């Protein structure tokens, strides 16, 4: 490809609206064009990157028996209502909803579990067809409340989604392991630093679930890592630093605490460490279209994990109750809520189980109780794991070694769904006894745009994008000083040679200074530069420089040999461009 024919432009100035590096560089380098809030057009440059990324995905999924399909973007509400997810997604206002001419409700697909389950239920003829792995690479839609970070959180985005159907839990686990390994190979080919972490299934399902996170400072997700084990902070089990409590139980006392509302206030007022105080939060739980309120107790030095609370209570969602809701349902102001005489169901985190002689509110304004003890003063609550993990907590899955905390961008998510969806759509087969058995389902997805944005966040430098060689739009840029007719002729000769061999060169044939072209090549993130400059004129040797700064002096006759050892060959993968 010649730069003069490439429909693109670069910019010297960053977009003031770009809040993250990946978005800034994609626009600055001519890869992305914003058409509306959270909606982007991919330029010819970026489409080449997309094609290479999706080719890697196809190669790895086809290698494990995946079969590509194309499922509809427009889906009926009726399908979603079968699984109960229509109401759940509507409550979060994430669906793009519309009606057809027959006044039937439809949505633009955020995911395809319902559609693929309906499809397989109609086409599965017997057990011999199992396991089956179907996948697609296509557009998804989410009406994000706050679309931001460019491709990280867009309203329209490109995803690969896979669906497996198996005849047993064991076969489902085998498929899960295959997809997990295939996803690892995909990210390994991008040379990214990533971790696989235990995760919460969210609204898709409550079965086994893991996320792939690319590590970078921008990451929206907090990742807890201990040795080879990792977990999203939403799902991380943790053992906090221990605290020694007295075995001598003291008589409970009521203490007037005017305007003493926070843990900090209590710590100062009683001159007592936070580990001796119980903090109680009120949560509002959404479950099957109704709202319920619960009190959650935790040790005063720790925070409640709302995702764990939601999972424990088998809720669709949960959030902290507002000040107004607390007064309405508990008849007391925030800051004076506690497990004593609590008017709503009360649960307690495991951190509170060993506590003795603790301080807590008793649901009266300006009153707290001291030297409170379980069983004697308060019936034992139902205990659960509601703890938000922190750096330094011990990891129960790794011989109680401490956690380190990192930021990550979620680029893929894999789930075992069991029979949740197959039961709704009667996806099954007849066993040897003639009885109907349900299929066991898995669902898996890679955010294509998010992965490429994460590449930039992790690998970019002060000069611009640094694409992994596997997905770079061009492998090597051929550069010469504009106006140098001899350099232009030599560059054109090498361009023809490399192009014929399938090494995807980009010939910068603009009438610009060599320094300008070098900066543009670095901004674009092209892995290598072939420079036809003063060195070639003096010595006849070609200078090749990698994006990371390594330099190679190559004789012209050895150029193809060097390229064959260092550059990928794409003779048939990317469609040819008219020259």
Swiss-Prot record:
In Gene Ontology terms, what is a biological process of this protein?
prolyl-tRNA aminoacylation
Which top EC class applies here?
ligase
InterPro entries recorded for this chain?
aa-tRNA-synt_IIb, aa-tRNA-synth_II, aa-tRNA-synth_II/BPL/LPL, Anticodon-bd, Anticodon-bd_dom_sf, Pro-tRNA-ligase_IIa, Pro-tRNA-synth_IIa_bac-type, Pro-tRNA-Synthase_IIa_type1
> Which GO molecular-function terms appear in the entry?
aminoacyl-tRNA deacylase activity; ATP binding; proline-tRNA ligase activity
Matching entries from SUPFAM superfamilies are given as: Class II aaRS ABD-related (SSF52954), Class II aaRS and biotin synthetases (SSF55681), YbaK/ProRS associated domain (SSF55826)
The record lists the catalysed reaction(s) as: tRNA(Pro) + L-proline + ATP = L-prolyl-tRNA(Pro) + AMP + diphosphate
Q: Which UniProt keywords apply?
A: Aminoacyl-tRNA synthetase, ATP-binding, Cytoplasm, Ligase, Nucleotide-binding, Protein biosynthesis
* UniProt cross-references to Pfam families, sorted A to Z: HGTP_anticodon, tRNA-synt_2b, tRNA_edit
On the tree of life, the source organism's domain of life is: Bacteria
Q: What is its main location?
A: cytoplasm
Name the GO cellular-component terms.
Answer: cytosol
Annotated EC? 6.1.1.15
Q: What family is this protein classified in?
A: Belongs to the class-II aminoacyl-tRNA synthetase family. ProS type 1 subfamily.
- Regarding domains, what does the record say? Consists of three domains: the N-terminal catalytic domain, the editing domain and the C-terminal anticodon-binding domain.
UniProt function note: Catalyzes the attachment of proline to tRNA(Pro) in a two-step reaction: proline is first activated by ATP to form Pro-AMP and then transferred to the acceptor end of tRNA(Pro). As ProRS can inadvertently accommodate and process non-cognate amino acids such as alanine and cysteine, to avoid such errors it has two additional distinct editing activities against alanine. One activity is designated as 'pretransfer' editing and involves the tRNA(Pro)-independent hydrolysis of activated Ala-AMP.
Q: How does it assemble?
A: Homodimer.
| Protein name per the record | Proline--tRNA ligase
Give the species this sequence originates from: Chlamydia muridarum (strain MoPn / Nigg)
């Amino acid at each position: 490809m010649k730069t003069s024919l490439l429909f693109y432009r670069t910019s010297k100035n960053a977009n003031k609206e770009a809040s993250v590096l990946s978005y800034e560089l994609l626009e600055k380098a001519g890869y992305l064009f914003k058409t509306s809030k959270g909606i982007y057009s991919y330029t010819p440059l970026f489409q080449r990157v997309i094609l290479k990324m999706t080719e890697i995905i196809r190669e790895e999924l086809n290698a494990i028996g995946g079969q590509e399909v194309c499922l509809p973007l427009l889906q009926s509400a009726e399908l979603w209502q079968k699984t109960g997810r229509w109401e759940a997604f509507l409550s979060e206002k994430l669906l793009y909803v519309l009606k057809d001419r027959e006044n039937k409700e439809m949505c633009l697909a955020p995911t395809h579990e319902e559609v693929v389950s309906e499809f397989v239920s109609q086409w599965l003829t017997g057990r011999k067809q199992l396991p089956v792995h179907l996948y697609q690479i296509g557009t998804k839609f989410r009406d994000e409340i706050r679309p931001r970070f460019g491709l990280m959180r867009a309203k329209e985005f490109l995803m690969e989604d896979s669906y497996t159907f198996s005849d047993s839990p064991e076969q489902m686990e085998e498929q899960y392991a295959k997809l997990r390994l295939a996803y690892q190979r995909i990210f390994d080919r991008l040379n990214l630093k990533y971790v696989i972490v235990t995760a919460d299934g969210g609204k898709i399902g409550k079965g086994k679930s893991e996320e792939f996170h690319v590590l970078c400072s921008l990451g929206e997700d907090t990742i807890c890592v201990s040795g080879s084990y990792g977990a999203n902070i939403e799902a991380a089990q943790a053992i906090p630093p221990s605290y020694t409590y007295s075995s001598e139980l003291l008589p409970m006392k009521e203490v007037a605490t005017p305007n003493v509302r926070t843990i900090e206030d209590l710590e100062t007022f009683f001159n007592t460490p936070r580990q001796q105080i119980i903090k109680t939060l009120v949560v509002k739980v959404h479950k099957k279209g109704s709202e319920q309120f619960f009190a959650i107790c935790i040790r005063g030095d720790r925070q409640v994990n709302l995702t764990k609370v939601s999972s424990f209570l088998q809720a669709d969602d949960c959030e902290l109750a507002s000040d107004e809701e607390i007064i309405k349902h508990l008849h007391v102001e925030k800051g004076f809520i506690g497990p004593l005489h609590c008017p709503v169901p009360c649960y307690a985190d495991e951190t509170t189980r060993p506590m003795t002689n603790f301080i807590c509110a008793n649901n009266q304004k300006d009153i707290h109780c001291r030297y409170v003890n379980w069983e004697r003063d308060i019936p034992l609550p139902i205990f659960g794991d509601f703890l938000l993990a922190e750096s330094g907590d011990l990891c129960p899955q790794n011989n109680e070694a401490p956690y380190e905390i990192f930021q990550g961008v979620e680029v893929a998510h894999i789930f075992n769904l069991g029979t949740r969806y197959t039961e709704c759509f009667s996806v099954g087969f007849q066993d040897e006894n003639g009885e109907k058995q349900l299929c066991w389902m898995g669902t898996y997805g890679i955010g294509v745009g998010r992965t490429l944005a994460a590449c930039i966040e992790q690998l970019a430098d002060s000069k611009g994008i640094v694409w992994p060689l596997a997905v770079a739009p061009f492998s090597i840029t051929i550069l010469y000083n504009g106006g140098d007719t001899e350099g232009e002729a030599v560059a054109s000769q090498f361009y023809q040679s490399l192009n014929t061999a399938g090494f995807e060169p980009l010939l910068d044939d603009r009438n610009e200074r060599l320094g300008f072209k070098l900066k543009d090549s670095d901004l674009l993130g092209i892995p290598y530069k072939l420079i036809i400059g003063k060195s070639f004129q003096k010595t006849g040797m070609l200078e090749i420089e990698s994006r990371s700064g390594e330099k190679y002096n190559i004789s012209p006759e050895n150029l193809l040999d060097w390229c064959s050892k260092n550059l990928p060959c794409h003779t048939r993968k990317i469609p040819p461009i008219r020259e």
